[in-house]
C-alpha cells in the first residue's frame, strides 16, 4: 500500500498520475475503514479525497498552510501527513487520531483546532497577515465547503482577505 509508506506530502511529489490515483483509492478505503469502525464524517471526507491529493501534490506542506473549515474533510489530509495508521490500524490507533484538525496531534500540519463553520477564511487571513509581517512567501490555502461559505464569518474573511490584497 502506498499510504502506509507516506510520511509527508513530499512523498507524493515523485508519483505518476496512475500512482496518485492509487493513493486516492487507498485513501478513500482508509477513510471508509475508520468511519465504519470508529464513526465520523464520511461524506465530506470522501468528497475531498482527490482534491486533497492534488493540493498536497501541488503545494508544499508544511511550509504552505492548509486551513480546514469545520475539519469535516480533513481525514484525507491526515492520511497523507503520516497518520494513515489511525485509519488502517486497530481501534487504539484510531482513538489516537482526532476527528478534527488538531495542532496537539500534528503541530506541523494542523494549524488550528476548529469545529465551527465558516472560520477557515478568517483564520487564513490571520496567517496571511502574519506571513506578510514576517516577509515570508508561503501559500495559505483556506478550504471551505458550500455549506460553510454561507456563514457571516466567511464573508467577513473574504472581505478582509480582499482588503489585505496579498493572497490566500
Question: Where would I find each of the regions flagged by the language model?
Answer:
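Cofactor-binding active-site loop characterized by glycine-rich and histidine/acidic residues
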Residues: 41-164
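Asp/Glu-centered strand-loop micro-motifs enriched in Gly/Pro and often flanked by an aromatic residue
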Residues: 33-42
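Cofactor-/ligand-binding subdomain signature composed of acidic, glycine-rich
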Residues: 1-34
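A short, mixed-charge helix-start or loop-turn motif at secondary-structure junctions
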Residues: 13, 37, 108-109
Amino acid at each position: 500500500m502506498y499510504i502506509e509508506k507516506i510520511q509527508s506530502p513530499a512523498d507524493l511529489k515523485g508519483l505518476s498520475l496512475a500512482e496518485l490515483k492509487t493513493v486516492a483509492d487507498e485513501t478513500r478505503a482508509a477513510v471508509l475503514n475508520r468511519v465504519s469502525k470508529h464513526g465520523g464524517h464520511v461524506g465530506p471526507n470522501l468528497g475531498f479525497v482527490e482534491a486533497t491529493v492534488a493540493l498536497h501534490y501541488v503545494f508544499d506542506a508544511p511550509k504552505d498552510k492548509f486551513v480546514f473549515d469545520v475539519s469535516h474533510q480533513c481525514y484525507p489530509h491526515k492520511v497523507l501527513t503520516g497518520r494513515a495508521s489511525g485509519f488502517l490500524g486497530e481501534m487504539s490507533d484510531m482513538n489516537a487520531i482526532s476527528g478534527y484538525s488538531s495542532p496537539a496531534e500534528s503541530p506541523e500540519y494542523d494549524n488550528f483546532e476548529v469545529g465551527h463553520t465558516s472560520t477557515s477564511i478568517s483564520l487564513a487571513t490571520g496567517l496571511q497577515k502574519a506571513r506578510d509581517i514576517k516577509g515570508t512567501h508561503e501559500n495559505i490555502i483556506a478550504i471551505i465547503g458550500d455549506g460553510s461559505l454561507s456563514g457571516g464569518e466567511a464573508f467577513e474573511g473574504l472581505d478582509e482577505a480582499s482588503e489585505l490584497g496579498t493572497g490566500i
